[in-house]
Amino acid sequence: MSIRPEEISSILKQEIERFSTEIETSNVGRVIQVGDGIARVYGLQSCMASELLEFPNGIMGMAFNLEEDNIGVVILGPDEDIKEGMEVRRTGRVVEVPVGPALIGRVVNALGEPLDGKGPIETDMYLPVERKAPGVITRKSVHEPLQTGLKAIDSMTPIGRGQRELIIGDRGTGKTAIAVDTIINQKGQNCICIYVGIGQKASTIAGVVKKLQETGAMEYTIVVSATASDPAPLQFLAPYAGCAMGEYFRDNGMHALIVYDDLSKHAVAYREMSLLMRRPPGREAYPGDVFYLHSRLLERAAKMSDEYGAGSLTALPIIETQAGDVSAYIPTNVISITDGQIFLETDLFNAGVRPAINVGISVSRVGGAAQIDSMKRVSGTLKLDLAQYRELAAFAQFGSDLDKATQARIIRGQRTTEILKQPQYHPLPVELQVLSIFAATNGYLDDLELEEVAAFEQELHTYFKANHPELLARIPKEKWKDIEPEVRAAVDAFKKGYGQRAAANQ
């Protein structure tokens, strides 16, 4: 076999022409210290705040402290494989998460990575976790109701779309239950829900997901999970990641509801990161910017004006108190940021009043504008009546010689308290809530035994569904003054029949 010189020269010529001299440049730093989920990196002079940094084994970190000669990096994952001297590369982008309809029905971590074993999330849309809150011009005042399905809330501390309503109470008082009931009640309301579990036990979040699946609520819900076993940086990022997912729907003219469960553990995770980074501690060892930590998150919940799509993002932050102390640092911060609070009490919970809402100090600063007319009219004096009843009940313990008017008020207060009780995972449509509260405030329950109230309410609802479905459908839409006579006549007819049946059974 003979080799011709011209062939060799032509092959060499082709190879030389194909040869490219592109040089890949990357900004590289080196790990000088690692431990407790943080790393100090030397180099990377042009690194941005909150920029994603890549370690050799694929683990990501976030630039948290930009100092004179090094960078404090929080590691978004396990830090066992990161060693001193390792290279760290810039990515040129800040922390961002996938957003869009592809996330609905999924359980993801704080970086938007799936945890439910249903395969990758098919979306090419990403948003940074830290975004500026909408300005004054782009907003509109809250005017549409967001029904929780809970009589005690929708009547006395109503929530509107775009509002921030704090749920606050000791552990074990039913805070998560209220949030989950609200999510379940959004079925058919064109509202995407996001549940963010921060620092919870993995079993607790699994229980919430199971209940949402059983009730069919997972069809319109995203769950963002940062459990107690996750590193503090992931617990810190989780609410911002969930908020970015909700903002996608808000900015596209849709309605979204986000639950942060809970922001006490979020503040603790941030405190841990700050102290490890040697930031100066303040009150209760929290860093000085812990107020801004929550205000910049909750300000992103908004009702957008019509020119900007008229979408909304409603936030239900949860705060856990210690022995009912609402004057601690984090509770007072979040109370001052939000548009009202629902305060849950251990004593009420243990007395069987569930949801265990303390009517006296629970308020909604904007939701009243969003109540439907019927609910506003029937529950107008409810809060005052209950407050007076509580006062009288405390006074009545000292003596039994009460006049008729005081006795009547106590009887009505007891029955009103009874009708506001509601079992977990049983949210009520607003028209049935109006019926129950109308019956309580107009004396239809006064002659019943306390034990009969729940059965009476159940039968009243069944009666209206069977005999007056068209009247029920009109309650949320029409003015109360136009339908009150018909509702009153129907309730009178039911009460008459109920009284006769009760007499026959005796």
From Swiss-Prot:
SUPFAM superfamilies: C-terminal domain of alpha and beta subunits of F1 ATP synthase (SSF47917), N-terminal domain of alpha and beta subunits of F1 ATP synthase (SSF50615), P-loop containing nucleoside triphosphate hydrolases (SSF52540)
Entry superkingdom: Bacteria
Gene3D superfamilies in the cross-refs: 2.40.30.20, ATP synthase alpha/beta chain, C-terminal domain, P-loop containing nucleotide triphosphate hydrolases
InterPro entries: ATP_synth_asu-like_sf, ATP_synth_asu_C, ATP_synth_asu_C_sf, ATP_synth_F1_a_nt-bd_dom, ATP_synth_F1_asu, ATPase_a/bsu_AS, ATPase_F1/V1/A1_a/bsu_N, ATPase_F1/V1/A1_a/bsu_N_sf
Pfam family of the protein (one): ATP-synt_ab
Subcellular location(s) per record: Cell membrane
Top-rank EC class of the record's enzyme: translocase
Keywords in alphabetical order: ATP synthesis, ATP-binding, Cell membrane, CF(1), Hydrogen ion transport, Ion transport, Membrane, Nucleotide-binding, Translocase, Transport
EC number: 7.1.2.2
NCBIfam families membership: atpA (TIGR00962), PRK13343.1 (NF009884)
Protein purpose: Produces ATP from ADP in the presence of a proton gradient across the membrane. The alpha chain is a regulatory subunit.
Binding partners and assembly: F-type ATPases have 2 components, CF(1) - the catalytic core - and CF(0) - the membrane proton channel. CF(1) has five subunits: alpha(3), beta(3), gamma(1), delta(1), epsilon(1). CF(0) has three main subunits: a(1), b(2) and c(9-12). The alpha and beta chains form an alternating ring which encloses part of the gamma chain. CF(1) is attached to CF(0) by a central stalk formed by the gamma and epsilon chains, while a peripheral stalk is formed by the delta and b chains.
Name of the molecule in the record: ATP synthase subunit alpha
Organism (species): Symbiobacterium thermophilum (strain DSM 24528 / JCM 14929 / IAM 14863 / T)
